[in-house]
A protein has these predicted regions:
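N-terminal leader/capping segments at the start of a protein or of a new domain
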Residues: 1-41
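A short glycine-rich, His/Asp/Glu-containing loop-to-beta-strand
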Residues: 51-77
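Conserved short histidine dyad/triad with adjacent acidic residue
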Residues: 71-85, 139-142
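Short beta-strand His + acidic residue motifs that chelate non-heme Fe in jelly-roll/DSBH
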Residues: 82-84, 101-102, 127, 137, ...
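Glycine- and acidic-residue-biased ligand/ion/polar-headgroup-sensing regions
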Residues: 86-105
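A short hydrophobic beta-strand segment most commonly corresponding to one strand
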Residues: 91-93, 152-167
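Short acidic-glycine-tyrosine-enriched beta hairpin
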Residues: 106-144, 182, 186
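Long hydrophobic alpha-helical segments typical of transmembrane helices together
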Residues: 173-196
């Protein structure tokens, strides 16, 4: 039996998405399969590299039914995502470097936000995830965060996210206006085809 590949992981995620409607159950069910893949990740050097020195994602798989997609995300040392909101579930596995994740919540409580709304947020946690760690996106109550690569090594992680790069709800907290602006996932991707 060969190594557990990205294709194997994608097939198992599809099966679990089809079975679990509840996002908490879905993300917990996906975790052991992601961990299995993380034992011997089959990413190319290009899929582990930043884009011209900046943070970016590399599209690895999009489900035919549009239910999820998989990207590798690379943050050069010291770079940050900025505070942003994911409006769909996600499971994230750290492959290299240390990700510092700062989580936030809205003062008015969990609610599905939209572009133009205020993003006055309170910090709820600051966590450090070394290689081998797995974390989750569980909106609306756990949809806001900021990720930063701490240390001297680039942060490389695999993200399994609900929707497609075009449909995954993704909003950036504009640092000056303190309002949410649309920030499509597709705009963050340097679409490196698998196997290149």
């Amino acid at each position: 039996m060969g190594a557990y590949s990205l294709s194997d992981l994608s097939a198992d995620v599809q099966r679990l998405v089809d079975v679990h409607d509840d996002i908490r159950k879905r993300t917990r069910a996906i975790e052991p399969y992601l961990r299995r893949w993380m034992d011997a990740p089959d990413l190319t050097d290009a899929q582990r590299a930043p884009c011209d020195g900046r943070a970016c994602g590399h599209l690895l798989h999009t489900a035919a039914d549009g239910s999820f997609f998989i990207i590798s995300v690379v943050f050069p040392p010291g770079t940050s995502s900025g505070v942003h909101y994911h409006g769909a579930w996600g499971v994230i596995g750290v492959l290299a470097g240390v990700d510092e994740e700062t989580k936030y919540s809205r003062a008015e409580g969990p609610a599905e936000p939209g572009a133009g709304e205020s993003c006055e947020l309170a910090q709820t946690a600051k966590l450090h995830f070394p290689p081998g760690s797995v974390t989750y996106l569980l909106p609306p109550e756990q949809g806001y965060h900021r990720v930063r690569a701490v240390g001297e090594e680039a942060g490389v992680s695999l993200h399994i996210l609900g929707g497609t790069p075009e449909t995954h709800p993704h909003l950036l907290c504009h640092p000056e206006s303190r309002t949410l602006v649309d920030f499509p996932m597709a705009a963050l991707l340097d679409q490196v085809p698998p196997g290149t």
